[in-house]
């Protein structure tokens, strides 16, 4: 998906990430609370974590980030789509490094 696709989804869900999240989401830090995951949309966003520079297992269960296509739909965008356990906001972040591994989501139009 490109950012237009993600923005359509965000608008449809009224930016409530709980509707995308499934599985067990862990608190970011000890003593914190993880927001609920309802998956009412059927999206099945499982918190598989991500690889940033080196594998960081502390991201597992807490984050889910997807590569996003640029406006030409031919290259990876500088910004990624991500969900995290401590909020039910749908967020974006700069990709930031060449050594990054994120999830891939395909859509059928």
Question: What are these model-predicted stretches?
Answer:
Residues 1-109:
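Conserved positions within compact, well-structured domain cores
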């Amino acid at each position: 998906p490109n950012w237009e696709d993600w923005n359509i989804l965000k608008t449809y869900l009224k930016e409530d990430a709980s509707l995308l999240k499934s599985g067990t989401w862990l608190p970011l830090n000890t003593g914190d609370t993880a927001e609920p995951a309802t998956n009412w949309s059927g999206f099945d966003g499982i918190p598989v974590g991500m690889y940033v520079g080196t594998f960081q297992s502390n991201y597992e269960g807490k984050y889910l980030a997807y590569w996003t296509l640029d406006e030409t739909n031919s290259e990876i965008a500088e910004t990624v789509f991500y969900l995290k356990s401590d909020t039910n906001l749908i967020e974006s972040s700069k990709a930031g490094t060449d050594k990054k591994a994120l999830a891939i989501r395909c859509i059928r139009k």
